[in-house]
């Protein structure tokens, strides 16, 4: 019963995605192009966040530690 409910939930989510993104009115080749472009954009955003967010967090930590006067013995 739980597996059926999960399957129905994912079907509902996919249906909502199709309605919101207007994929329901596209032809199959248009839908595949749209999904490919969307997946590529999402992958690039996730990769960029994975690469650059830790750098920005470190720089913000250094900036605020200098302002607040916190000096770590581990830092250079």
Swiss-Prot record:
Signal peptide segment: none
Presence of the UniProt keyword Endoplasmic reticulum in the record: yes
GO BP: ceramide biosynthetic process; endoplasmic reticulum organization; sphingolipid biosynthetic process; sphingosine biosynthetic process
Pathways involved: Lipid metabolism; sphingolipid metabolism
Transmembrane segments: 12-29, 37-57
Tissue localization of expression: Expression is seen predominantly in the prostate epithelium with weaker expression in the fibroblasts and endothelial cells.
Major subcellular location class: endoplasmic reticulum
Subcellular location(s) per record: Endoplasmic reticulum membrane
Keywords noted in UniProt: Endoplasmic reticulum, Lipid metabolism, Membrane, Sphingolipid metabolism, Transmembrane, Transmembrane helix
Short name of any one Pfam family annotated for the protein: SPT_ssu-like
InterPro entries the UniProt entry points to: Ser_palmitoyltrfase_ssu-like
Record's GO cellular component terms: endoplasmic reticulum membrane; serine palmitoyltransferase complex
Segments on the Lumenal face: 30-36
Reported induction: Expression is suppressed by androgens in the androgen-sensitive LNCaP cell line.
UniProt GO MF annotations: serine C-palmitoyltransferase activity
PANTHER family: SERINE PALMITOYLTRANSFERASE SMALL SUBUNIT B
Function: Component of the serine palmitoyltransferase multisubunit enzyme (SPT) that catalyzes the initial and rate-limiting step in sphingolipid biosynthesis by condensing L-serine and activated acyl-CoA (most commonly palmitoyl-CoA) to form long-chain bases. The SPT complex is composed of SPTLC1, SPTLC2 or SPTLC3 and SPTSSA or SPTSSB. Within this complex, the heterodimer consisting of SPTLC1 and SPTLC2/SPTLC3 forms the catalytic core. Within the SPT complex, SPTSSB stimulates the catalytic activity and plays a role in substrate specificity.
Assigned protein family: Belongs to the SPTSS family. SPTSSB subfamily.
Assembly and interaction partners: Component of the serine palmitoyltransferase (SPT) complex, which is composed of SPTLC1, SPTLC2 or SPTLC3 and SPTSSA or SPTSSB. The heterodimer consisting of SPTLC1 and SPTLC2/SPTLC3 forms the catalytic core of the enzyme, while SPTSSA or SPTSSB subunits determine substrate specificity. SPT also interacts with ORMDL proteins, especially ORMDL3, which negatively regulate SPT activity in the presence of ceramides.
The protein's name: Serine palmitoyltransferase small subunit B
Biological source species: Homo sapiens (Human)
């Amino acid at each position: 019963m739980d597996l059926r409910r999960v399957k129905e939930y994912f079907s509902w989510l996919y249906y909502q995605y199709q309605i919101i993104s207007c994929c329901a009115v596209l032809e199959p080749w248009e839908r595949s192009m749209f999904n490919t472009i969307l997946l590529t954009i999402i992958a690039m955003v996730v990769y960029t966040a994975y690469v650059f967010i830790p750098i920005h967090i470190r720089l913000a930590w250094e900036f605020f530690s200098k302002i607040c006067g916190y000096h770590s013995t581990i830092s250079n």
